[in-house]
Regions:
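Structural signature of the two symmetry-related core transmembrane helices
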Residues: 71-85
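Cytoplasmic helix-loop-helix junction between adjacent transmembrane helices
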Residues: 99-132
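Residue-level signature of mid-helix packing/kink "hotspots" within the transmembrane helices
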Residues: 49-57, 136-137, 141
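Symmetry-related core transmembrane helices of the 12-TM Major Facilitator Superfamily/SLC fold
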Residues: 154-172
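Hydrophobic core of transmembrane alpha-helices in multi-pass small-molecule transporters
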Residues: 14, 83, 93-111, 210-211
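Juxtamembrane intracellular "pre-TM" segments in multi-pass secondary transporters
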Residues: 1-3, 173-207
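Helix-loop boundary and gating motifs at the non-cytosolic
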Residues: 2-49, 201-238
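Helix-to-loop junctions at the C-terminal end of transmembrane segments
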Residues: 54-68, 147
Length: 240
């Protein structure tokens, strides 16, 4: 198949979110079933957003420095493969915290990089991103089924399949073209942050986002455990 074809861009979006769903939808349920309590589950699941605070700007900076969001994405996703293997065979709190937080933080950080690759492609980004939603939905349902029918650990095998496939797809797409500008604007990071946090509308936006996404994330984290506690199955969690 021709390099940088629509199929590779669609495949990147599909399998990226396909793999992402394995952890995002099923992590809390898995931790509950291996006998972690609510406090331990919240500690593990809340660590990912904290890791993301540092991972997202760092990977963005690396992508700009090396002018290759594609290469940065490949390295980051390869690290998630290694972390996933460690996560699969560990039941120690600190190891599960570090590995799961690293995986989810890197996926959060790679999301804008893959979007950047898709936007710069010769294809309609909406038609590329649509496949990400399809991949997430299919994976969530599939993970629920194999969780019940085979074994809970099987969802991490699905993650490996999705991540390795998205690595192959990213290898077959092109980096965004770098547009050189004649004039370079020099600015101080300190001054930029200072002016940003003096912007009242920006602060209000941050507060709204904080409470909105905090509530959504709390609900999304524990809904799987709640469904299981009232007699539901992992398949129902995947459907939700």
């Amino acid at each position: 198949m021709k390099k940088n074809s629509y199929m590779y861009h669609a495949g990147t979006s599909f399998f990226f979110y396909f793999a992402f769903a394995c952890y995002n939808a099923m992590l809390a349920l898995y931790l509950s079933d291996i006998h972690f309590n609510a406090q331990q589950i919240s500690l593990i699941t809340s660590s990912a957003p904290l890791f993301s605070i540092f991972a997202q700007p760092y990977l963005g900076t690396l992508a700009d420095r090396f002018r290759s969001p594609r290469k940065v994405s490949l390295v980051a996703l390869f690290i998630t493969v290694v972390m996933n293997v460690i996560f699969m065979f560990s039941h120690q709190l600190i190891i599960l915290l570090i590995t799961s937080a690293t995986i989810l933080a890197l996926f959060n950080a790679v999301t804008p990089l893959t979007d950047r690759i898709g936007v710069s492609s010769p294809y309609d980004f909406g038609k590329i991103r649509l496949w990400g939603s399809v991949g997430y939905a299919i994976s969530a349902q599939l993970c629920g089924l194999v969780y019940d029918v085979i074994a809970p650990i099987s969802i991490f095998v699905i993650f490996l399949f999705g991540t390795i496939t998205v690595l192959i797809c990213i290898l077959r797409v092109n980096d965004p073209e770098v547009v050189e500008t004649e004039t370079k604007v020099e600015y101080s990071a300190k001054e930029a942050y200072k002016s940003l946090f003096k912007n009242k509308q920006y602060i209000i936006f941050l507060l709204i986002s904080f409470f909105f996404w905090g509530a959504c994330t709390a609900n999304f984290t524990y809904i799987s455990v709640f469904i299981k506690s009232v007699g539901g199955t992992a398949s129902m969690v995947g459907t939700y």
